[in-house]
């Protein structure tokens, strides 16, 4: 495990649930885009936020939003339906903030 910040677009609205004795947890995925040798690549990062911050995220984040999420990264192995193995990147977030798209400028 290690700490990281990832910026990407929300793939869907957050999914809120309550566990144990009412602890709020919100889950969502963001698409992180980057260029490598003139090839546009996308990696989906699964995020979870717990506690009061989860409630705030559920109220303020929406599908399509550009968001920066910071927290602890883990890799969860799983097996696809075709039997091949892969890993899902998961980020247990300790913070988030909405971002403004880069490259946009206001014309005077």
Q: Residues of each region from the PLM?
A:
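Single-stranded nucleic acid-binding surfaces, predominantly the OB-fold ssDNA-binding core
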Residues: 1-108
């Amino acid at each position: 495990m290690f700490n990281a910040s990832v910026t990407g677009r929300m793939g869907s609205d957050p999914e809120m649930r309550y566990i144990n004795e009412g602890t709020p947890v919100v889950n969502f995925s963001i698409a992180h885009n980057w260029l490598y040798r003139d090839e546009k690549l996308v990696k989906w990062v699964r995020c979870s936020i717990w506690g009061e911050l989860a409630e705030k995220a559920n109220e303020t984040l929406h599908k399509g939003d550009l968001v920066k999420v910071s927290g602890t990264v883990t890799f969860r192995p799983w097996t696809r339906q075709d039997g091949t193995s892969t890993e899902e990147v998961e980020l247990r977030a300790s913070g988030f903030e909405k971002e403004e798209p880069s490259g946009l400028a206001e014309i005077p």
